[in-house]
Amino acid sequence: MDVRFTEVGYTYASGVEAVKNVSLDVPTGQRLAIVGQNGAGKTTLVRHLNGIFQPTTGTVEVGDWVTKGRTIAELSARVGYVFQNPDEQLFARRVIDDVAFGPKNLGFDQERADAAVAAALEATGLTAEAETHPHHLSLSERKRVALAAVLAMETPVVVLDEPTTGQDERGVRMIASIVAALHSQGRTVIAITHDMDFCAENFERVIAMAQGEVQADGTPSAVFALPAVLEKSRIEAPQLARLAEALGWAERPLTIESFVDALPAHRTSAG
């Protein structure tokens, strides 16, 4: 399902203008990462998708729905939102109940709900913790419970707010595989992240924000090659790109595969 922001602005009651005239089209099935320092307007922008915020100016559309006037309950059928802090969305006494809440609320029949819950628990590595109280789990595990709860809803749009924060290497790989699976299913994935390596390796489009405005919009290789954008957005290029720069390479590979592919040519020139 496609998503569209048209000249969206949002001003808090305090008078702070958090989002300024942002226009974006996100096609169905795209993987989009939004990057920038804290306070850049990233979370404020995407929280318009699930109805938590309504735009001060402009319009937000999810598929053929304009979000303004739609309830959070209505929008939850189209947009699954995984919060940065999992405790904002976990409330049940058992993991399985948190994960089952969405399908039940969306009116899934029992067979479909059971299948969706089982698949979500398996995808997030939580099958063995199904009967555990979420607050007896670690932060990384609770974040995976929150993710499982959204996966079970089978929404066409999935929003991930800082999905890799607090995750170990195994957890990051698991989330990357989930993003790939969602993409293969034709679902739209929008992630807010400070993890530039995760961003570069798993998303085909990157938007850099600063002070409520879009500073750059393009492929990871294009955006991370713009020093002025990196400076204004207060972000660093991915580690492999910085390593290539330190080695004096002209190109800036962003993934392990592209870095390895470039090695033979540089070994030849060095020899």
Provide a role label for each language-model segment.
Residues V35-Q37:
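The feature captures the beta-strand-to-loop junction immediately N-terminal to the Walker
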Residues N50:
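Helix-to-loop junction immediately C-terminal to a conserved catalytic motif
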Residues G58-T67, L75:
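Conserved ABC transporter NBD signature motif
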Residues E111-E129:
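Conserved ABC ATPase "signature" region
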Residues H133-L137, E141:
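Conserved ABC ATPase signature
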Residues T193-H194:
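H-loop/switch region of ABC-family ATPase nucleotide-binding domains
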Residues Q211-G212:
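Conserved ABC ATPase "signature" C-loop
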